[in-house]
C-alpha cells in the first residue's frame, strides 16, 4: 500500500528553511544553526519576567534552560509549566503566556483561532526529537513493525500480540496513548493512523504526559505506547519502524533522527504570538536556547541539538 508522506515530514526531509508567510498560517524562524548571540548593553530585561507553557516533551529542555538562564542572569524570572502542545498554542494565542512549547506545527484550527484574534504565530525550532514506539519487555526483546502494523494495534484491529507477528505472546495488547491535544499524540497519529484511516481504539489507556506513559509501559506487561526520544529507558523495548512493507526497519538513534531516516522524526518548537521585540527577555531567552550553551543543555536532557545544516540541505 502506498502511503502519502505527511506535509510536515516532507518539509523537513527536503530541508526547506524559509519564513512561511502569514497567508500560510504562521511564520517559521529560518535559523536552525545556533546563532552568535550579541546583546546590546541594556539592563531593562534583567528585571523582567515571562511565562511559558505547553509540550511535555519540550518541558525538560525549556525548564533546564530557564534555570540556567536565571542562574546566569539573576533578577530575571521565567516560569515553565506543561499541559501539552495544545495548551501551549491556545495560551499563546489568548495571551496567557509569553511563549508556548510545541512538539508539532499548529493545527488548522489553531491557525484559524490565531487569525481571528489578530495573532501571527512565530515558531522557533529548538531541538530534534522522535516519537518512539515502545513496548514492555514481556512482549519481546526485539520487535520490528511497519507503520501500518503499529496503526492496526492502536486502532484495536489487532487485540492480541499473537495476531501481530508469529511467535509473539498470545496475550491481550494493553494500548497506552497520550491525551487529545498532545503534540506527541498528534505526530504519532499523523504517521501511523491517519494515512490508513485509523482512529484510536476506545479501549486505549490515556496518560497525560511522557513520564506517565513511560511509567505505565515499564510496569505493565504486554503494553505498547509511544514517548519522545528523551524519555526512553532501559526498562522498555524500542520498536524498529519501517514506513511500509519492503522498506528498511530503522531504530531511533542520534544518527537516524538527525538524518530523518527514522520514520517519526520531528522538531520541537517554541512559539510566540508575534516576533519578539529585540532585546526583550523573550527574545533573549529564545536566543539562549539556540546558543551553543543552550544546545548543550538540549543534549544533556537526552534530545538532539539542531543540525548545522538542514537535512537534505
Regions flagged by a language model, labelled:
Residues 1-4:
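Juxtamembrane low-complexity tails/linkers enriched in Ser/Thr-Pro and polybasic
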Residues 6-313:
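Exported/periplasmic ABC-transporter solute-binding proteins
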Amino acid at each position: 500500500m502506498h502511503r502519502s508522506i505527511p506535509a510536515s515530514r516532507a518539509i523537513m526531509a527536503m530541508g526547506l528553511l524559509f519564513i512561511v508567510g502569514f497567508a500560510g498560517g504562521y511564520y517559521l524562524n529560518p535559523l536552525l544553526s545556533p546563532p552568535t548571540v550579541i546583546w546590546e548593553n541594556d539592563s531593562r530585561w534583567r528585571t523582567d519576567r515571562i511565562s511559558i507553557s505547553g509540550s511535555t516533551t519540550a518541558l525538560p529542555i525549556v525548564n533546564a534552560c530557564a534555570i540556567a538562564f536565571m542562574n546566569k542572569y539573576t533578577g530575571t524570572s521565567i516560569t515553565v509549566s506543561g499541559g501539552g502542545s495544545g495548551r501551549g498554542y491556545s495560551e499563546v494565542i489568548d495571551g496567557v503566556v509569553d511563549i508556548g512549547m510545541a512538539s508539532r506545527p499548529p493545527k488548522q484550527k489553531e491557525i484559524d483561532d490565531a487569525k481571528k484574534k489578530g495573532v501571527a504565530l512565530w515558531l522557533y525550532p529548538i531541538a530534534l526529537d522522535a516519537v518512539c514506539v515502545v513496548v514492555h519487555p514481556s512482549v519481546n526483546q526485539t520487535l520490528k513493525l511497519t507503520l501500518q502494523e503499529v496503526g492496526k494495534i492502536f486502532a484495536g484491529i489487532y487485540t492480541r500480540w499473537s495476531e501481530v507477528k508469529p511467535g509473539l505472546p498470545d496475550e491481550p495488547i494493553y494500548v497506552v496513548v497520550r491525551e487529545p491535544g498532545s503534540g506527541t499524540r498528534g505526530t504519532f497519529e499523523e504517521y501511523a493512523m491517519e494515512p490508513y484511516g485509523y482512529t484510536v481504539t476506545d479501549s486505549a489507556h490515556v496518560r497525560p504526559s511522557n513520564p506517565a506513559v513511560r511509567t505505565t509501559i515499564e510496569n505493565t506487561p504486554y503494553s505498547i505506547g509511544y514517548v519522545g526520544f528523551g524519555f526512553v529507558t532501559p526498562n522498555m523495548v524500542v520498536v524498529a519502524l519501517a514506513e511500509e512493507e519492503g522498506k528498511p526497519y530503522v531504530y531511533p538513534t542520534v544518527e537516524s533522527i538527525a538524518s530523518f531516516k527514522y520514520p517519526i522524526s520531528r522538531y520541537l518548537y517554541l512559539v510566540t504570538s508575534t516576533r519578539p521585540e529585540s532585546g526583550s527577555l523573550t527574545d533573549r531567552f529564545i536566543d539562549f536556547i539556540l546558543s551553543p550553551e543552550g544546545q548543550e543543555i538540549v543534549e544533556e536532557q537526552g534530545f538532539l541539538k539542531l543540525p548545522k545544516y538542514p537535512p537534505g540541505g
